[in-house]
From Swiss-Prot:
InterPro entries: ARM-like (IPR011989), ARM-type_fold (IPR016024), Armadillo (IPR000225), Vac8 (IPR045156). GO terms for biological process: autophagosome assembly; establishment of organelle localization; nucleus-vacuole junction assembly; pexophagy; piecemeal microautophagy of the nucleus; protein localization to membrane raft; protein localization to phagophore assembly site; protein-containing complex localization. Residues 598-607 have a biased composition (Polar residues). It is a lipid-anchor. It is found in: Vacuole membrane. This is Vacuolar protein 8. Residues 519-558, 572-630 are annotated as: Disordered. Transmembrane segments: none annotated. Pfam families: Arm.
Length: 630
C-alpha cells in the first residue's frame, strides 16, 4: 500500500488522484473515531477497523501516522491476541518512521503484541528486529525504553534468542543497560537476562561486553535491576570459561553477591545465593565465599520459611563445603543442626539431597568433623528417615553413613545405634547406588569395628534376611564390584575371630558354595593392565585417600579369587577336593597386583596389608560416595 500511495502522489497524476486519496484518509479517520467510540464491541484486528488503521499507517501525513500508532498502542494495551501479517505490517511500517512520537507509540504497540507467543515469532520473521535496533540507538529516551521493552518480550521465546543474538542487538542492549533512565536500564537488563539461557547466546553476550556492566549494576538502587543482573550473572557462571573470565576481571563480584543476600527483596536474596552456588563450582570461589563473610547470610537463609531461599542456600552451602579448607569454618559457624533438620524437609527432596551431601562433604577428611556430625545427631536422624525417603535421598544418606563408618573411633557407636538394621534392607534397594552405598557402609563398619561383634550377630538373619541374605545376593551378583565388597566384608568379619560370626558363616551352605565357586576362578594376568599406585609408596595415600586408578575388571576378579580363598582358609572348610591343614589366622599371602596367593607376596589379610588398603579405597570410592562431591 505504501508503493501505491507513492504512485498516487506522483506529479504527473497529482491533480487526478490527490482528492481521492485525501478523501480515503478522511473516511479512515471518521471510521476510526466511530470504532473507538464503540471499542468494547469492535475487533480492530480484522475487517474495516483494521483497514482504517492500515490506511492511516501508510499515509504520508505524519499526523495521521501518529493517530494510527497511538490507536494501535491503546488498543493493544487493552487486548492482546494472536494476529496475522495484515496487522503487523502497518505497525512495522510505523516503526520505521522518522518521527519520535510515531516510533514511541508503534514500539509500544509491538511490545504489547509481543506478549503473545505466536506474535513473538511473527514479529521476528517479518524483520521486526532491524527497526527496533535502530530505535534503541535513538536519542529519545521514550523511544529507547519502548524498543528495549519490545526486545525483552521477543527474547522470552527460545526460537528468537539466537536470531536476536546474531542481529547485532546485544551491543546496544549492553550500552542501554547503563542508561540514566531507570526504565530503560530495567528493560535492557531484563533483555540481557533473557539472552542468558543458552551457552551460545551467553558467549555472544560476554563478547558484547555485558559482564562488567552486569557486575556494576549489582549495586543499583533498583530491585528489579539487581534481580535481572544477579540472575543473568548466575546463568553466565554456569560455564567454566565464563567463571574464569569473572575471576580474572571482577574481583569484587563475591562481595557484591554476599551483600545482596541481605537485600530487602526475597527474589534478589535467592538469586544471589544461586549465583554464588554456580560460582562455587570452582575452588577459588568456594574459598572466597567463606573469606568474604558468605556463611552468615547463608545460615540465615537456611532458617527461612520460604522454600526458594532454603533451596538456593542449601545448594550454595553444598558447593562451598566441597573445599576441605571450608569444612571446619562451616561447622564452627553453626550449620550442623539446621542441615540435620533439613534432612526431614519432605516438602522438597532436592533440599534433603543438598543437606545430606553437605554433611557428607563436611565429614570427608577430618576425624574431628566426623565426630561432630555424629554427636549432633545426624546418624539418628538418618536412621529414622532413610527407609522412607526418596531414592535420591537414600543414595546420599547411605553414602554419608559409609563415609562416617570409615572412622574406627565411631564404628562402635554407629553399631550401637543399630545402623545395620536400616542398611541391610537397603542392600536390596531398586537403586544400584543405594545398594552399593549401603553395602560399602556395612563393609566399613565390619573393618576393625570393635572387640564386640554382637551387633553383626544380631542382624545375621534379620531384618529382610539379614546380613546373611545380603552377602548371598552380592556374592552371586553379576557385578564384580558387588562380589568384591561382599568377599572383602566377609574377610573382615572372620578376622574379628568372633566365634558366633565364624560359625554363622561356616554353617551357611549357600554362602560357602558361593565362596567356593569364586575361589575356583583362575586369577587373570596383569599383562596389559593399567599401572596402579605402589601400595608401599606413602605418596600413594592411605586407605581413606582417593584411589584414582582403581582396579580393572581383570584385577578385580583376581582380588576376588584371593579373598575367596582366604575366606575358605579362615573358615577351615577349604575348596572341594583340597586339603587345608593350617589354622585360620596364619600368615597367608594375599594376591598382590592380581596374582594368586603363594607367588612370593608377603601382604597379609590378617594385618590388613597395604594391597587391601588400596582395594578398600577403590571399593569405597566406587560405592560409598567416598568422600566429598566433585
Amino acid at each position: 500500500m505504501g508503493s501505491a500511495l507513492s504512485s498516487c502522489c506522483s506529479p504527473r497524476r497529482k491533480n487526478a488522484y490527490e482528492p481521492l486519496l485525501l478523501e480515503t484518509e478522511r473516511e479512515a479517520v471518521a471510521d476510526l473515531l466511530q470504532y473507538l467510540e464503540n471499542r468494547s464491541t469492535t475487533n480492530f484486528f480484522a475487517g474495516s477497523p483494521l483497514a482504517a488503521l492500515t490506511t492511516l499507517s501508510f499515509s504520508e501525513n505524519v499526523d495521521l501516522q501518529r493517530s494510527a500508532a497511538l490507536a494501535f498502542a491503546e488498543i493493544t494495551e487493552k487486548e492482546v491476541r494472536e494476529v496475522g501479517r495484515d496487522t503487523l505490517d502497518p505497525v512495522l511500517y510505523l516503526l520505521s518512521s522518522h518521527d519520535p512520537e510515531v516510533q514511541r507509540a508503534a514500539s509500544a504497540a509491538l511490545g504489547n503484541l509481543a506478549v503473545n507467543a505466536e506474535n513473538k515469532l511473527l514479529v521476528v520473521s517479518l524483520g521486526g528486529l532491524e527497526p527496533l535496533i535502530r530505535q534503541m540507538l535513538s536519542p529519545n529516551v521514550e523511544v529507547q525504553c519502548n524498543a528495549v521493552g519490545c526486545i525483552t518480550n521477543l527474547a522470552t521465546h527460545d526460537e528468537n534468542k539466537t536470531q536476536i543474538a546474531k542481529s547485532g542487538a546485544l551491543v546496544p542492549l549492553t550500552r542501554l543497560a547503563k542508561s540514566k533512565d531507570m526504565r530503560v536500564q530495567r528493560n535492557a537488563t531484563g533483555a540481557l537476562l533473557n539472552m542468558t539461557h543458552s551457552d551460545e547466546n551467553r558467549q555472544q553476550l560476554v563478547a558484547a561486553g555485558a559482564i562488567p556492566v552486569l557486575v556494576s549494576l549489582l549495586n543499583s538502587p533498583d530491585t528489579d535491576v539487581q534481580y535481572y543482573c544477579t540472575t543473568a550473572l548466575s546463568n553466565i557462571a554456569v560455564d567454566a570459561a565464563n567463571r574464569k573470565k569473572l575471576a580474572q576481571s571482577e574481583p569484587k563480584l563475591v562481595q557484591s553477591l554476599v551483600q545482596l543476600m541481605d537485600s530487602q527483596s526475597l527474589k534478589v536474596q535467592c538469586q544471589a545465593a544461586l549465583a554464588l552456588r554456580n560460582l562455587a563450582s570452582d575452588s577459588k570461589y568456594q574459598l572466597e565465599i567463606v573469606k568474604f563473610g558468605g556463611l552468615k547470610p547463608l545460615l540465615r537463609l537456611l532458617h527461612s520459611s520460604y522454600l526458594p531461599l532454603i533451596l538456593s542456600a542449601a545448594a550454595c552451602v553444598r558447593n562451598v563445603s566441597i573445599h576441605p579448607a571450608n569444612e571446619s569454618p562451616i561447622i564452627e559457624s553453626g550449620f550442623l543442626q539446621p542441615l540435620i533438620e533439613l534432612l526431614s524437609f519432605d516438602e522438597n527432596e532436592e533440599v534433603q539431597c543438598h543437606a545430606i551431601s553437605t554433611l557428607r562433604n563436611l565429614a570427608a577428611s577430618s576425624e574431628k568433623n566426623k565426630g561432630a556430625i555424629v554427636e549432633a545427631g545426624a546418624v539418628e536422624k538418618i536412621k529414622s528417615l532413610v527407609l522412607t525417603v526418596p531414592l535420591a535421598v537414600q543414595s546420599e544418606m547411605t553414602a554419608c553413613v559409609a563415609v562416617l563408618a570409615l572412622s574406627d573411633d565411631l564404628k562402635p557407636q554407629l553399631l550401637e545405634m543399630g545402623i545395620c538394621e536400616v542398611l541391610i534392607p537397603l542392600t536390596n534397594s531398586p537403586s544400584v547406588e543405594v545398594q552399593g552405598n549401603s553395602a560399602a557402609a556395612l563393609g566399613n563398619l565390619s573393618s576393625k569395628a570393635a572387640e564386640d561383634y554382637a551387633p553383626f550377630n544380631a542382624v545375621w538373619n534379620k531384618p529382610d534376611g539379614g546380613l546373611h541374605a545380603y552377602l548371598v545376593r552380592f556374592l552371586s551378583s553379576a557385578d564384580i564390584t558387588f562380589q568384591h565388597i561382599a568377599v572383602w566384608t566377609i574377610v573382615q568379619l572372620l578376622e574379628a575371630e568372633d566365634e558366633q560370626l565364624t560359625n554363622n558363616i561356616r554353617s551357611s551352605p549357600i554362602l560357602i558354595s558361593s565362596i567356593r565357586q569364586l575361589a575356583k576362578s583362575p586369577p587373570p594376568s596383569r599383562a596389559g593392565g593399567a599401572p596402579r599406585h605402589d601400595p608401599n609408596d606413602p605418596s600413594a595415600g592411605s586407605s581413606e585417600d582417593e584411589f584414582e586408578d582403581g582396579l580393572t575388571d581383570q584385577e578385580g576378579e583376581g582380588e576376588i579369587v584371593s579373598l575367596a580363598r582366604r575366606i575358605l582358609d579362615l573358615t577351615e572348610v577349604g575348596e572341594e577336593g583340597d586339603e587345608f591343614g593350617e589354622r585360620a589366622g596364619r600368615n597367608v599371602p594375599v594376591g598382590s597386583h592380581g596374582q594368586a596367593p603363594g607367588q612370593g607376596q608377603t601382604s597379609q589379610v590378617g594385618s590388613m596389608g597395604s594391597e587391601h588398603a588400596a582395594l578398600r579405597a577403590s571399593v569405597h570410592r566406587a560405592l560409598s560416595g567416598g568422600g566429598r562431591d566433585r
